[in-house]
Amino acid sequence: MDKYDGSRVFFREMCKNNRDDFPYRRGVIMSELHTPCCPVVCKLILPDPLTIDFISKIQQKPFLCIQFCSVLPCLEILEEFDRRSKNDKSLRRFVDYEGATTLLTFNELFNKYSRIEGNQFVFHVDSDKYLLNEHTSKKIIDLINPSISIIPTLSLKHSERKKWSARKRTKLNDLYQTYYETLSRYPNSTKLVKPIHPCIELKEMGDFEVIEFPGFGFGESLNERYEWIKEMGKNLTGKEVRIIQLKTGTPLEILHAVLMGFDVVISPYPESLSEQGFALSFELPSEFEGNYEPEYVLNLLNERCKFFDGVYKDQIKDIVDLKNSVHIDVVESLMDEKSVRKESRAYINHLLNCKEMNGNIILSSHNLYMYELLFQRIRDSIENDTLVNFVYNFIQLNVKRD
């Protein structure tokens, strides 16, 4: 692995793979956030029901992903607080992300995509209708002051490439240009994330320090995803922070994204599993047998991760259904021996079946911790130049056996 002392301030590479087709690397964002990494996706404006303090016990540097649609219902309150706090410095902050790196995303990670009316995006939150235009986007960024913010634009799913009409392509590009020009015109400490898409003209857009690959996670195979990502990234310098947002974001999707060179992988999977009563439980290899080529391992990932009923599902043992009655008497087994949570499977089963909110809170913290463990092992294997073998052995160690 090549070593770098790093001359860039925002993102510093620590080591990287030499192969152009698989540009995975270890790095640091803003001298604190170690990559590759996965932020905690907030369904609301706050990481409720978990607190920043608790997340800091899971992640060395709390990293939160906040959605535009979750901020919109609170916009009037945020504006009122901002107005009053200028005259009263003793007011308790309405939203406090102190100590955390924050990423503001346009994608609705738990719902269907928004509709468009003119140049405005239409969201429906709890049966209420909210509109987002470029000026509202600017207002939200000013009030929230996120570390990083993805520029809103129309989403065209790569799984529907054949259906992209010239009108849709033009609409996506025009929307992006409008929002980009508005958001980049004003001074702000927020680093703007620019999407890379076949329909977006990127001329005269300056130096890309952070980029996003939108439109993935909607039914394309992992092999198709690989080919399209390679096509979209062929003109990049390799110095940019790469972000991908996945609609499912399973462990095998995570490993695939890291092999493809992504530094930040946004996945709602830990939270989605928690809502359904599922706990992540997988083995992490400590020894890596063999010497495998990336192409072979990518094909293996493609075979083991399939799209069913609107979501991706890994064909490995990685989750446990704690609502299942088989866990009623399992009082000595934890959700996973590696977990930060020490409650038994029987206790969680009881909480879930009684519809106690604490059951989902415990599951949420457990699942987030399991993903943090996975990413830590990914970072270690990149430093040791064993990532490809780690991915292969992870699959083999967790394969379902009849």
Curated annotation (Swiss-Prot):
Keywords from the named record: Glycosyltransferase, Transferase
UniProt GO molecular function: glycosyltransferase activity
Zinc-finger in keyword set: no
Top-level taxonomic group: Eukaryota
Keyword Glycosyltransferase assigned: yes
Gene3D superfamilies, sorted: Queuine tRNA-ribosyltransferase-like
A Pfam family annotated for this UniProt entry: TGT
Protein's GO biological process: tRNA-guanine transglycosylation
InterPro entries, sorted: Queuine_tRNA-ribosyltrfase (IPR050852), TGT-like_sf (IPR036511), tRNA_ribo_trans-like (IPR002616)
Family as reported in the entry's similarity comment: Belongs to the queuine tRNA-ribosyltransferase family.
Full protein name: Queuine tRNA-ribosyltransferase-like protein
Organism, scientific name: Theileria parva
